[in-house]
Structures are given as C-alpha cells and as structure tokens.
Amino acid sequence: MPKERVDVLAYKQGLFETREQAKRGVMAGLVVAVLNGERFDKPGEKIADDTELKLKGEKLKYVSRGGLKLEKALENFGISVEGKTTIDIGASTGGFTDVMLQNGAKLVYAVDVGTNQLAWKLRQDSRVVSMEQFNFRYAEKTDFEEEPSFASIDVSFISLSLILPALHRVLADQGQVVALIKPQFEAGREQIGKNGIIRDAKVHKNVIETVTEMAVAEGFSVLGLDFSPIQGGHGNIEFLAYLRKEEHASNQVVSEIEPLVEKAHREFKDE
C-alpha cells in the first residue's frame, strides 16, 4: 500500500488551504483519522495514502468525504434527485448514497463488489437497499424492483466502458447519470506514471475524449463536465461527467474538454 506524509495527505484532502497550514495543523494535533479517531501530530509521518482524515471535532457532512464529489456535480449540473429511485454504483462506505438521501432520494440501491463497507447508519436506513458482492457489469433490469432514474458511478480498477452498457439496460429512459472519470483506470498502462499517478494533461484530455465518445456510443448524451473537488487515490485528478440516457445520444461537451483539463491542472498545480 503506497504511503504519504500526513500533512501532504491532509492538504490533498482539502483540510487546509496550503501545505504550510497543514503542517502546522498536524503539529497542533488537529488532524485525526475518520475511521478510528487516531490523532496524528507528526507532519512527516507516513501513513497509507487511502487513509481518510478530518479535523478534530469536525462533523463530516457525509459518511465519506467522497460525497463532496457528487455534491459538486448535483449543484453544478443542476440535477435534482428528490423523490427519485437511484443507484450508487461503487458505493463503498456510502458517501454518494448519503448525498442522495440528504437531497431527497426516495430509494437508493447501494451497489458494490465488496462487503461490509457501507456505513452502519446507511445500512439501517429503510430507503437504502444494500447490494454487496454485486458486480454491476452483469446487472440486469430484473435485479432492481424499482426502475432507477438517476445513477452515480464511482468505481476503481475497472473502466467505465464495462459499466455503462449494463447501466443502459437498467436505467429509465431519460435517466440521468453522474460518472466519475478516473484517468488512472482508463488510460493505457504506458501512460500511467510512478505510483499510479497521471500528471500529463494530454493524457487527461485523451481519456475524457475517449470516455465521452464511448458514452455516446452506449446511448448516453454527454451534457456536462467538471473536475472533482478532491483528488482520488495517490493524488490523481479526477473528472465528473453528466450523462443522460437518450435514444439519439450526442456529445455536447467536445469544446469544453481542453479548457476544463487546463483549469483542473491550475487548481491542483501545487499538489
């Protein structure tokens, strides 16, 4: 498991505006692990880079900081999930599920290939159907009692090209999708740098072009693009795509790709 300095990780996860602030914050004992509350007070200490951190005493808005990704997408793309049946593909601890519930979703299918990851408070919620050890690429309409009209996708170690065909089978016509594009799982192996990090803006641009073209081919119009407000594993920049299932799908973001990638790289240039 790759490791990262506590102060760098705290900065990357958005707890502080600068690395210097993060360093001082760690030394002051302000940074703790979300999972078990362990406190870190040595900025240079190296911990697993997938350790989720928070500020001491901070009440997280969602069960996972990852929920901030979907929150941004719903706000920026003007999507409402109120009263809808939805799917959270790659639910993990349930950050996206939590966002959907807090925004009025009627029912959420929380789907994940793993087991025992979904937060306890979500397991206990009658509006959540937990579908563990479920490989969504083989999903069929009959797997879902209610037809979903919204889906989020946040998957790792698998390309969206294996998820979208299954989602097309399951999702209602005109159903909306927020898909997290993770270049590190879409690019060719030769394009991925040390520790699984992609820093080349050209690779990001090519990945987004490929994924959006593939989405159209699978019957989804591409209506919007943005970058994730927080970085993914190992510090990778990730992107948000707004899709809609349509009979005559089209790509409406072609001209936005290059400016968006440039903007994302400016935003995270010191990471």
Language-model features: where?
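Conserved class I S-adenosyl-L-methionine
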Residues: 81-92, 100
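S-adenosyl-L-methionine
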Residues: 109-162
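Conserved beta-strand signature within the Rossmann-like core of class I S-adenosyl-L-methionine
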Residues: 174-183, 187-188
